[in-house]
Amino acid sequence: MPIFSSLNSFLRRHKKKLIVTATLTFSAYFLVNQFIIKKLKNFQNSLRQELFVKEQIKRRFVQTQNDCYLTILALLPVLTQPIINHLPIELITQALKLKKTNSNPTPQEISDSLLTTDNLTMHQNTNDSSDLSHYMSLSKTELWKLLKIKTLTRTLTLMYSISGLLLLTRLQLNILARRSYLESAIILAGGKVNDTETSQDYFIEQSYLSLSWWLLNKGWLKISDLVEKVVTEKFNTINARTELSINKFDDLLCEMVNELSTNHNQEILNAVFPISYDNLIESLLNTNPELIKELDIEDSIMLKLINETTYLVSNEAFGDILINMVDSCKSTLIENLLLSLDPENAYTNQEKVIDISNIKQFKLANLLAQLSIQCGVLCDNNNLMNDTFSNELSGNIYMNNLNEIESLDEFSASIYSNFE
């Protein structure tokens, strides 16, 4: 047929051109197709890698915060026992009880029921006869005044010291966790880390963590001295028989915290971490004296860790978070006082509903007895968790509430994610 013959003739005439065109067309299609597929696969791989990295960062961050919490629970006895011994309200109480048994009570005397073992404390110090004889030489009025000052001082000192230790530990462990993550990322990217350097870094990191020695051995005492001065000024004219509502007592605590935050903030920060060079040297001398020379090496890991920590502790945000943590402790204290002294106003239908405007008046002596119990709760590192509000005091609700402060988590996240 003419059509087929002309088509056949066309194909013979343009055979080479058609073959070249077809080859080029299929080659171009194949190359473009492969390029697109490869790009798509690369995008999918990078997306999966990004999600994996984000998940790893999140998992490590959560684990670091849990490690901080467990570390604090382990360190609680190390921090709190010296504070308890330094402010021996149990010994003062024993002297008061002995004096009461040796004299006839008058109508104006405070009831012996306020001095029972159950009401006064969950801690018992070893009775040192010389210390007891010293307190026995004081009058009842002097003993009550001393008990008032020491009980309030112990309570606030524990609040500040525990809050400071938790905040410092969060700071330190998140800095180290960030370093550890970066090293892991380098290894995953094909880089190498010298085993000798890794071993040395571990030693330096442990030495860096041991700088909490300052707060555990020196800082709490400086905080205690500051607190005692403020307590003495605020409660000097209030005696043990004075009746206070929990609302008024809360106001007095707020005034003392505000005084400490306004006029003694830098001193408290200096007590939490050895910011000054002299305090830093003293801390290293008592922990790892061989690392003092690292302070003179500009690019040493130890110096970098200390400089970053000093900068962050000196930052206004650190002080603000510490105040938030102390406020959290104070709020928990007030709730627990209401639960113990005025349970009708403490909760309704198993939920905490505080009606401070319609509560009873209590002698300061009663409040002091409850403060002693709350100090025991603050020091508890067993962290027994209970669902029922009535049994809440069997665990360290103070630590639980501190650990859930939003600004503390935000601060930790900002440190952990700072990869500059």
Swiss-Prot record:
Keywords: Membrane, Peroxisome, Peroxisome biogenesis, Transmembrane, Transmembrane helix
Record membrane topology: Single-pass membrane protein
Transmembrane regions: 17-37
InterPro entries: Peroxin-3 (IPR006966)
Entry keyword Ion transport: no
Membrane side Peroxisomal: residue ranges: 1-16
Gene Ontology terms for molecular function: protein-macromolecule adaptor activity
GO biological process: protein import into peroxisome membrane
Domain of life of the source: Eukaryota
GO cellular component: peroxisomal membrane
Subcellular location: Peroxisome membrane
Pfam family, one: Peroxin-3
Topology feature Cytoplasmic, residues: 38-420
Disulphide linkage map: none
Family: Belongs to the peroxin-3 family.
Chain's role: Involved in peroxisome biosynthesis.
Protein name: Peroxisomal biogenesis factor 3
Biological source species: Debaryomyces hansenii (strain ATCC 36239 / CBS 767 / BCRC 21394 / JCM 1990 / NBRC 0083 / IGC 2968) (Yeast)
